A protein has these predicted regions:
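Bacterial N-terminal signal peptides that target proteins for export
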Residues: 1-12
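Histidine-acidic metal/acid-base catalytic patches
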Residues: 27-39, 46-63, 98, 186-297
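Active-site-proximal loop/turn and secondary-structure-junction residues that shape catalytic pockets
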Residues: 44, 69-71, 108-111, 144-148, ...
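Conserved beta-strand positions in the central sheet of alpha/beta enzyme cores
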Residues: 66, 104-106, 141, 179, ...
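Charged helix-capping and loop-helix junction motifs
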Residues: 81-88, 118-126, 153-164, 216-222, ...
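Active-site acidic/histidine proton-transfer and metal-coordination neighborhood
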Residues: 96-98, 111-203, 211-212
Length: 297
């Protein structure tokens, strides 16, 4: 009798494992067919370059994560595990296991560090491009941040253009794209991209930039155009969840992107409810669910 119960338990355990694997495979296959996919920033869900980011993203039903290169500070390059083949493989295995993809490789260190003034920019970009190549990720996210804000520091424009032209050549070698986030409006950002003149440098459009400056998101997207749009940070400065944000007309945004025939990743960075700003699962779960409701229905 005990042996029979043991066999039954083993059989049930095997079924659970097989069902989990099958579910992840079905989920991954379904994600591949979606025109719009929804990701979360690993550093914003407090899992910067941690394997747990995949599990948490899966739990809140995100299709992927934007995987950060790690801290920068005054280091010559990013504090990244991803240059180590053994560590890198762990991330690739976890992505496959959970069915959670990698939307892009982020260089979030440039939020605070100056892309225009740092000496070792070549090493940083090359490390990121190598990571993209080794992880088969086609997009890198580069925020120009406070230190290279072209609205406040227009004198930095020539050096930023020069460096982005060089960076475009490097990422072009692997057929990838560096998606830059600037403080410029869509008209000025398009002019910047035209001046750079490299198909491997595009825009990472941020809802927050438009909303914080009183601009209509859909109009800005139309101006920027499909050609220059690599990915979208589909969230605003922390106040309320996206579904409660009166400044974000999500059905209108989807209609605009449909008309542009654009497809790609919508990435949740913020839009946290300030009354529960530290509740990661509630904030990111709600925003992911709302984006999927609008864009994947």
């Amino acid at each position: 009798m005990k042996l029979t119960n043991f066999k039954r338990s083993v059989f049930i355990a095997m079924l659970v494992v097989l069902f989990g694997t099958f579910s992840n495979a079905v989920s991954a296959q379904s994600n591949k067919k979606q025109k719009y996919k929804v990701a979360v920033c690993d550093w914003m869900i407090l899992k910067r370059q941690k394997l747990g980011a995949f599990g948490l993203a899966s739990e809140i039903k995100a299709d992927g994560i934007e995987l950060d290169m790690g801290g920068l500070g005054k280091r010559p390059t990013f504090d990244s595990k991803l240059g180590d083949p053994i560590e890198r493989q762990k991330f690739l295995d976890k992505s496959k296991e959970t069915g959670v993809g990698i939307s892009s490789i982020a260089m979030s260190g440039f939020y605070a560090q100056s892309f225009a003034k740092r000496d070792s920019i070549n090493l940083m970009i090359n490390d990121c491009v190598a990571t993209m190549k080794n992880m088969k990720v086609k997009v890198a996210y580069l925020p120009l941040g406070t230190e290279s804000d072209l609205t406040k520091n227009p004198e930095l424009r020539p050096i930023i253009i020069e460096r982005l032209k060089w960076a475009g050549k490097q990422v072009g070698k692997i057929g990838g794209v560096i998606a830059i986030e600037t403080s410029l409006n869509a008209t000025e950002e398009k002019k910047l991209l035209e001046e750079i003149g490299c198909k491997h440098i595009k825009s990472s459009f941020n809802f927050a930039n438009a909303v914080d400056n009183g601009r209509d998101i859909a109009t800005e997207l139309k101006i920027l155009g499909k050609k220059y749009l690599a990915q979208i940070h589909a969230s605003t400065t922390d106040t309320v969840w996206l579904e409660n944000d009166k400044n974000v007309d999500m059905p209108k945004i989807k209609k605009t992107l449909d008309e542009m025939n654009w497809k790609g990743w919508l990435i949740v960075e913020r839009s946290r409810d300030v009354t529960q700003v530290h509740n990661v699962k509630a904030n990111y779960g709600a925003n992911v669910a709302y984006l999927k409701k609008i864009f994947q229905n």
